[in-house]
Regions:
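An N-terminal assembly and electron-transfer interface module characteristic of large anaerobic redox
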Residues: 1-174
Length: 174
C-alpha cells in the first residue's frame, strides 16, 4: 500500500454536486494507513484566491506535522519549488556552515524523510507559487516562515541575506 495518495478532483465533481468531504472521510476510514492529500484541478471554478498551482503546493504539505518536542530549531526546510537548490547556492553553502541542517522535498526518498520536513524550526520558500502554502504550513505548526525569492540583483541578495541572519540569529553570523 502507498503511504500517501494525491487525489485530484476536477470541476465536474463540483458541477454534479459530489460530497467530497464524505468521499475523503470514507477513504480515510477504509484505509487509515494511507494519507489522502486533497488536490484540485478546477480552473473553471477559479474566480479569485489562490491559483490551482498554489493550491497544489499547499496540498502537498498539508500532511506535514510535528510534535512540539521534535521541532529542531537548527533544521530549515526549503519548500515550495519544483527543483532543489543547487549545492553551490548561497543558502546551501552558508546555512550548514552556520550549523543548520537543510532539507528539501526533492531529496526525500521515503515517506519518513518527507515527514521529517515538518520538524524544521524554519520554513523557507524561494519560489512565488510556493509562498501561499508554505506560509500556511508555518502558521499551522507555529514556526518561522521566510520568503526569500531567488534574485540576480546583488542589492536584493544582500538584503535577503540580512533578513535571513536577522531572523535566525546564529551564534557565528556569516
Amino acid at each position: 500500500m502507498p503511504k500517501a495518495i494525491l487525489l485530484f478532483t476536477v470541476c465536474i465533481h463540483h458541477f454534479i454536486g459530489c460530497d467530497l468531504e464524505r468521499i475523503y472521510r470514507e477513504l480515510e476510514e477504509q484505509f487509515p494507513e494511507i494519507t489522502f492529500l486533497r488536490c484540485y484541478m478546477d480552473p473553471i471554478m477559479q474566480k479569485h484566491g489562490p491559483t490551482p498551482d498554489q493550491k497544489l503546493r499547499k496540498a502537498m504539505y498539508e500532511s506535514l506535522d510535528s510534535e512540539p518536542d521534535k521541532m529542531d530549531t537548527k533544521q530549515i526546510s526549503i519548500l515550495g519549488s519544483d527543483f532543489a537548490l543547487d549545492q553551490s547556492s548561497d543558502l546551501k553553502e552558508l546555512l550548514p556552515k552556520a550549523g543548520y541542517t537543510v532539507r528539501e522535498l526533492q531529496s526525500c526518498r521515503t515517506w519518513e524523510e518527507y515527514k521529517e520536513l515538518g520538524n524544521a524550526g524554519t520554513f523557507l520558500c524561494c519560489y512565488p507559487s510556493g509562498k501561499y502554502g508554505i506560509e500556511l504550513l508555518a502558521k499551522r505548526l507555529d514556526r518561522t516562515f521566510l520568503y526569500l525569492p531567488l534574485s540576480f540583483d546583488y542589492e536584493e541578495i544582500k538584503k535577503e541575506e540580512e533578513i535571513l541572519w536577522n531572523t535566525l540569529k546564529p551564534e557565528d553570523n556569516q
